[in-house]
Amino acid sequence: MNAIRIRDASSRWIAALLVVLTLATYWPTFSNGFVNFDDDGYVTQNHFVQKGLTLSGMAWAWRATIMANWHPLTWISHMVDVQMFRMNPAGHHASSLFLHALNVVLLFFLLLKATGFRWRSAMVAAVFAVHPLNVECVAWISERKSLLCTTFMFLALFAYGWYVRKPGVARYALVALLFALGLAAKPMVITLPFALLLLDYWPLGRLPAPETAEARALFWVRLRALALEKLPLLLLSLASAYITVIAQARTNTIAANMYLSMPVRIENALWSYLMYLEKAVWPVHLAIFYPHPENTLSLWKPLLAALLLMLFTEYCFRHLRQRYLLAGWLWYLGCLVPVIGVVQVGRQAMADRYAYTPLLGILVIVVWSVADRSPAMARRAEVLGAVSALALIFFSALAARQTAYWQNSFSLFEHALQVTPANFIAENNLGQAYIEVGRPDLAYEHFLRSTQEKPHFGLAHYNLGVVLAGQNRNEDAGKEFQMAIQYGQEKLDVAQAYHNLGVVLLAEQQWSKALAMFSEAIRLMPNKESSYLARGFTEFHLADYRAAASDFAAGASLAPDPNALFWLGRSREKLGDLAGATEAYRKALALQPDLAKAKERLEAIVSGRPLPFLQQDEP
């Protein structure tokens, strides 16, 4: 890396100003709360995270693959937040903002050290700090993973520059360690070996310019050597990819989107590359979710995108003297590969958060190109300074406004509905927000619209079924739960739909069918205690007391529950096992001393009195 000193007073002042700019832009996040899109799975309803930083929680973090990812460091960072701030969202937002500010400063010093250009580096870092596309990563607590993996990525780039100055095993090991930590925060950093090859080309200059036949031959020889140098890092990437595929297979995340043909996915990927560039230049109408067009995308769009992408790629190859062009362009294209949608994960066409690091390639191209093409401009410093200031004010104002939309689930998804058509995710989550405030009547309309806009969206059918069941419209609710089972993406959602369908069937006194539904729920989620209890109740009604006792015992072992233990006692009574019934009643009373029915039956058994008659001898 360049020998310029990065600890001089000017650099420190610039870094401080970058932090101030970042804090000023994102200050509204401190008044934002949690939202009902992934924040429940990551924080608000995750009982491991809610315990704070514990040994059992950290052990769980290293083996957990929920939320379709393996990212133990992300889990641990959320646990640290709960340990420090409990469930105060301002504290969680403060941690995310700290990481983003840290990334901004790291980026500035990284570019400064690598290129020696102070003001160019500062401008790239400043736009990165306030660009509205990055709001999603900063304002969304669930996107801690993007911030954290980027921190380790930038640290790995610093370590790589240190290694390049004096190659050695210890220095390379530090690069590998930081890369591994980044992968343990979010697997999107999987492209780091490719990114390091780009840094070898520019700005590190480890590859010769392929301008002559002799130079091209040397270029390929050197490129092969540098690629082999990255082999240990590539092995880490492959290991991370394997773990990620396993995690997503367990939640059915990839398989659920296999109905999208490869041509459809490629068309959307090409168009998304162009849309990210459009939003980089004109970042308006941003939303938390952009519905996938599936097979409705006009053919001219991917064709136009492919043409423009090829033209600019050809332009970069024709201007190899400006190495930053090809390096920045390939950085943008390459870093988006894991999330561009060729392997479709999730239902989105694209996502703002995916541009967090790929956007850097475009920023470098723009800033370096403007600087290189304006040396003879009259009053160059004043003009470039004014243009830079206006750009930062523009982006910062838009980012602050976008941050305000993240205040709560209502503002977030109402805005998404305003700027994106047929946004079935926004409709569904807005409905969930109304459920949380006790307005199922308003939620109903949003769930219904979600199912109309996306008939194959299982979660909306499930939520609609819950509302209908609450209105005692059991037949309609049952149909919605069946749709949720048919179209559900994740095992947990499908298991819950089976469970609720069983409850509806119980209300209709269809005992055998209900029993089958609860059994399916347990098959999908063997640790779902409520389904064991529901199946036990059904078996008790059908006089299968041995099976009922087994299910009540299983449910109570998963989550100690006085009601489950009481009915375990009743089942054992029916089997003539009074000693076992006594044990169950005592355990129930230990959990709930005022459980009168358990106390009454326990006293009758102990005293030898006739057992009291229950008017309804079933759950």
Features from the language model and the residues they span:
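Polytopic membrane enzymes that build or remodel cell-surface glycoconjugates and lipids
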Residues: 1-472, 476, 486, 493, ...
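Canonical positions in the second alpha-helix
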Residues: 416, 449-450, 483-487, 520-521, ...
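Structural marker of alpha-solenoid helical repeat scaffolds
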Residues: 419, 453, 487-490, 524, ...
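Conserved alpha-helical positions within TPR/SEL1-like repeat arrays
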Residues: 425-436, 459-470, 496-507, 530-540, ...
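Terminal, low-structured helical/coil segments at or just beyond the last alpha-helical repeat
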Residues: 574, 582-586, 590-619
